[in-house]
Amino acid sequence: MTSSNSTVPDSRSETKKFLVLLLGSIGVVYGDIGTSPLYAFRESLRPFTANGVQHEHVVGLISLMIWTLTIIVTFKYVLFLLRADNDGEGGTLSLLALLMKKTGSYMPVLFFAGLIGSALFIGDAMITPALSVMSALEGMKLVTPAFSDYVLPLSALIMVGLFAVQSKGTGAVAVFFGPITVVWFLAMAWGGLIHIGDDWTILEAVNPINALWFITHAGWAGLIVLGAVFLTVTGAEALYADLGHFGRKPISVAWFILVFPALALNYLGQGALVLSNPAAIENPFYLLYPEWALFPMIILATMATVIASQAVITGAFSLARQAVHLGFLPKLMIRFTSETNTGQIYVPAVNMVLFIGVLVLIFSFGDSESLATAYGISVTGAMVVTTLMAFQFLRSIRGKSAFTAAILLAPLFSIEAVFLAANLLKVHDGGWVPLALAGVIILVMWTWTKGSRYLREKISKNDVSLDTFITSLERSISRESRSAPVLVSGTAVFLTSVPDKAPSVLLHNLKHNHVLHEQNVILTIWTHDKPYVADTDRVEITRISKHFMRLDINFGFMDDPNVVKALPLCKKKGFKFEIMQTSFYLGRRNLIATPNTGLPRWQEDLYIALADFGVDPSAYFKLPPNRVIEIGEQVAI
């Protein structure tokens, strides 16, 4: 009886936890894709408006939208990619880390694919807030045309407020994201349902034959339209990127029981409305609703778009943290805004870049119609990259042959490649914007990675073996020779990225100060290609000699690299740190560009600028400021 009764609370607790994750996934994961009906069908129809919209065009478009959602989101992301996790974490960089760990080698093609996918996602994080919020507010034009002049300033004002609150954390308001988004999806389903009866022939769109007919008969205009059709799956990458926050099951269940049905019903309703009333092409989404519901829907849409914007901003913060830990970006200041949820972070540098980018996009494009042309490229590009990496996943992780992996992914890749080609046709109409943004981000990450690798190779030429150095030093101390340093009480910690070489800061300290602490710790901080490291594996201590020991602290690429919090774990390994008796020695390198080196001069200058932009290691690793001693050195690159 006892064991039977004890399982009931456990079962209820698990159910409650699942429902919380389910609700959260609806608000965060599906916020972006849930706002696509605001503009996707409207923009897809635009090329046909000049000659009049034909029945087969509407049915074909809606069929294409529904089956794009089915193939791309359902099959690729929900049923396949959600299973391609790195210890529970998803996303482009997480998949890249998993593949590089499995292959055990540096693969340039894989590396650049990861950079391209990440860069395109950052571009998406700029365009999504601008496009979605403007689309929502433009509905006010249906209430009163006089509101047209206020769309831009109000959109900018909302963005100012959204980015301003990032530093405070979103935990307090995030609890409302799920319920608001659930109401939004239900409202979309209702709007579609009440209009499907306007023209029952719209149900023919469920047949994929109509989608194929549209592709083969719509001609050049059809290829252009494909770029707009892909707007229906914007935000699909969030399913994979947020896998670690919510888990596969809640994300999958939310898609099948609410999100997909609501989207399909809304698109079917918009199609039936336009078939029965061609004038509704002006704004088919808002015209689904009765006049009394229009203003509430505009308010609800604005809240939904803000939530969608928050989702991509959070995703950009998370991606930046992964990029820093994996060595693709310099160390950035990362602040945790929640004591219980490590996924809630704030990255000031990324926040500022996104904020400036969003405002520039809002005032440069002026309306959602113009900005929509720029949107598809970043989304399709990121998806194509993910599919290419999925090919390597099937080979390296699942053990499939290259032929089998190609057969499995060829249909998906072909579809996405066609969509990408369609979007590339819009380069001159604004599509160059996400490409330019991605190009800049790729250049930054590539320069940092290449420069860091070159700097390590150059410094290593002058390295001194740690074991040889310590043996010589201990011998001089035991013999009390004149060259022996003065021993002082306390513990000194010397940070180094190369544990088998004597840290340059240790050498400089002995050279200039001629002192050595009674206990000296050679500390190396490792960031592993898995999301988290358990506390039991966090620290490793090795005694080298009487006065020296080696300490390795292990973090995952999603962990908070807090050294002070990790040090107490050393007590279980036989060494207790007294923080107030411990000094942390860091080397500060002053980089100087020099001619005739391994990097072009412009890349040297960019690397030095990035190094100056990065946060101090003492702040990044949360070292106590009053216990840190920095010793500088000039390094020519």
UniProtKB/Swiss-Prot annotation:
Catalytic activity entry: K(+)(in) + H(+)(in) = K(+)(out) + H(+)(out)
Similarity field: Belongs to the HAK/KUP transporter (TC 2.A.72) family.
Name of the featured protein: Probable potassium transport system protein Kup 2
Transmembrane domains' residue ranges: 18-38, 61-81, 107-127, 145-165, 174-194, 211-231, 255-275, 293-313, 345-365, 371-391, 402-422, 429-449
Native source organism of the sequence: Agrobacterium fabrum (strain C58 / ATCC 33970)
Function: Transport of potassium into the cell. Likely operates as a K(+):H(+) symporter.
Entry-linked PANTHER family: LOW AFFINITY POTASSIUM TRANSPORT SYSTEM PROTEIN KUP, OSMOTIC STRESS POTASSIUM TRANSPORTER
A cellular component term, taken from the record's GO annotations: plasma membrane
HAMAP family (UniProt xref): Kup (MF_01522)
Keywords tagged on the record: Cell inner membrane, Cell membrane, Ion transport, Membrane, Plasmid, Potassium, Potassium transport, Symport, Transmembrane, Transmembrane helix, Transport
Main location: membrane
Molecular-function annotations in GO: potassium ion transmembrane transporter activity; symporter activity
